[in-house]
Every structure is written in C-alpha cells, then in structure tokens.
C-alpha cells in the first residue's frame, strides 16, 4: 500500500553510500520546522516546493545529490525534478533511516 515506506534495499544502500563517498550533498526536502526537529548532520534544507527554483544552484555544486524527507514521498518528488534536470540524484527515503545507515558505516 505505502510502497514508498519500504526499507531501502541493499543495492540502494550501496549506491547511496558510494554517492556519499563521492561527496554527495544530502538535501532534506521537509519544511524548516520539520528539519529543526531532527536532521542528518551536514544536510541542506531545501523544501520540496522550492526544488524547481533551486535546480541551477544545485547543478553548480557538481556533486551527486541524495534527497530525504520524513517518509520518502517528498524526496521521491524532488528526485524526479532533479533527475529530469540531468543531476545525479538518489532517493534516500526517510531521513532517520539514512542517518542510521550512515552511522552503521562509521561504526
């Protein structure tokens, strides 16, 4: 029913971790209030409704991008916009899940 809530597969994890090793920028597309309640250290907060207007700025970073949100739905929307603009982008799904994956790699 809520397929966007599924856990990232091992293949997805590998791709995302490889992108992080290449210097990927994590964009949290939740609203600023949600972002302040918890986020991945070093991530940038660009709400999903602002992604289209920030495409050129994001493109200039010249780095892979990983989008996250609360459930994975808004980050999927942002991924579609960025992908259509030719940006290398991955949907990291829920921010707290990606934070756990990153922490496990560090440990």
PLM regions with names:
Residues 2-15, 22, 32-64, 73-107:
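Rhodanese-like catalytic fold shared by cysteine-dependent sulfurtransferases
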Residues 25-29:
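Short hydrophobic beta-strand that contains or immediately precedes a catalytic carboxylate
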Residues 68:
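Short, surface-exposed ligand- or partner-binding patches at beta-edge/loop junctions that are enriched
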């Amino acid at each position: 029913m809520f397929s966007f809530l599924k856990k990232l597969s091992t293949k997805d994890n590998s791709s995302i971790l490889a992108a992080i090793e290449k210097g990927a920028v994590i964009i949290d597309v939740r609203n600023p209030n949600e972002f302040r309640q918890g986020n991945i250290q070093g991530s940038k907060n660009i709400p999903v409704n602002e992604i289209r207007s920030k495409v050129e700025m994001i493109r200039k970073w010249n780095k892979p991008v990983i989008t996250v949100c609360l459930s994975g739905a808004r980050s999927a929307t942002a991924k579609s916009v960025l992908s259509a603009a030719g940006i290398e982008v991955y949907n990291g799904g829920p921010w707290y899940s990606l934070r756990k994956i990153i922490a496990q790699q560090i440990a």
